[in-house]
Amino acid sequence: MTKERLLAALDKPRTTRGLLTVVNPGGSEDQVQTMLMQMREEGLVKFDINKGLWSRA
């Protein structure tokens, strides 16, 4: 799983679980969450706390 694949999967806002099923079915949700947090710190993605959705920044 790469940052590029995660960004490509964010063609629309998705939940962490939704991203996992698109990018790496059967993978670790913790791994996706960790990568998303790193990408958020870099300003690549944002999280809507009210809706629970990740999207491109």
Task: Give the label of every model feature segment.
Residues 2-7, 29:
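Short, leucine-enriched amphipathic alpha-helices that occur as contiguous helical runs
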Residues 47-57:
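Short, cationic-aromatic polyanion-contact patches
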Residues 26-38:
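Short amphipathic alpha-helical interaction segments
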Residues 22-24:
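Residues within the alpha-helical elements of helix-turn-helix
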Residues 43:
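Glycine-centered, phosphate/nucleic-acid-interacting loop/turn motifs that mediate DNA/RNA or nucleotide
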Residues 9-18, 27:
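Short capping segments at the starts of secondary-structure elements
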